[in-house]
Structure formats: C-alpha cells, structure tokens
C-alpha cells in the first residue's frame, strides 16, 4: 500500500507529464546486496564492516528507542534527484520492499522516500506489530514531500 502527503502527490502528478524510463533495478540491487541482519534488524552496511558482536545494541536502543529506530537510522541513503526522477519513487519503494522481503522473508518492509531540494532520502525498516511506524500515519504533518510504501 502506498501513502503520501499532498506535497508528494503534487510532485508525482507533475512527473506524470514526463517520460519516466530510468531503471531503478541496478540501484536497488546494490542497496539490497549491502544489507545484513544485525540483532534481528535489516541494516544497510555500505562497507561490509559491521560486526554484530562489536555493537552495543542496548546503548543504541537507549538512544533510538526501538528496533525500528535503529533500522531507520542505519538505513538512510541519499541520492541526487537527477539520478532517479520522482516519477520513479513509487516503483523504487515497491521494488525495494519486494527485494528485501525476498531476501529476508517473511519480514514485511516499510520504505520512505522524502525530498530535500536536489536530493531525495530513502529509508526503510522492518514492519513490527509491536512497534509503531517510524513516521506518523498522517504524512501531511511533515513539511517535506514524503511517500511511504507499506
């Protein structure tokens, strides 16, 4: 299910006027290939240097609140809007969720995309029934264009 605030909807509606032919599969494959499980969390590890036994997980949870907060803080990636056009955001979010689900089945993945000037931020976390989503369900509360794939 896709959710977005009004600002993102306007941007995507404008993007429908343009031809969106950029392929996101290569970008997504690189992201998914650099993820691993740390303490039952899916974590993006760009350098492959994270070692579970060296992570003070209790201290991290103290600062971020829960596993969702940990994942979202680890899984923050920024890209130029020139690399992937906003009209591709729904496809990007859905495919990333699907690819991570396939790799880490049966965990359901929530993907967020938000815009900041000339770049966009991509974040993701595992959906946990005992924890809240990272962002409020009312995405119009935020002052940036945001899309959420659940």
Can you annotate each of these PLM segments?
Residues 87-90, 94-150:
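Acidic, proline/glycine-rich low-complexity IDRs
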Residues 1-73, 77-81:
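N-terminal leader/targeting segments
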């Amino acid at each position: 299910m896709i959710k977005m605030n009004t600002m993102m909807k306007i941007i995507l509606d404008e993007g429908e006027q343009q031809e969106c032919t950029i392929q996101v599969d290569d970008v997504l494959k690189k992201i998914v290939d650099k993820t691993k499980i740390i303490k039952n969390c899916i974590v993006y590890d760009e350098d492959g240097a994270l070692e579970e036994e060296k992570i003070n997980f209790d201290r991290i949870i103290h600062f971020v609140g829960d596993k969702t907060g940990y994942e979202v803080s680890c899984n923050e990636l920024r890209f130029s809007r020139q690399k992937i056009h906003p009209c591709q955001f729904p496809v990007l979010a859905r495919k990333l969720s699907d690819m991570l689900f396939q790799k880490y089945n049966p965990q359901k993945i929530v993907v967020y995309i938000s815009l900041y000037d000339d770049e966009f931020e991509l974040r993701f976390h595992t959906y946990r029934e005992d924890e809240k989503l990272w962002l409020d369900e009312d995405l119009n509360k935020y002052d940036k264009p945001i899309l959420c794939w659940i």
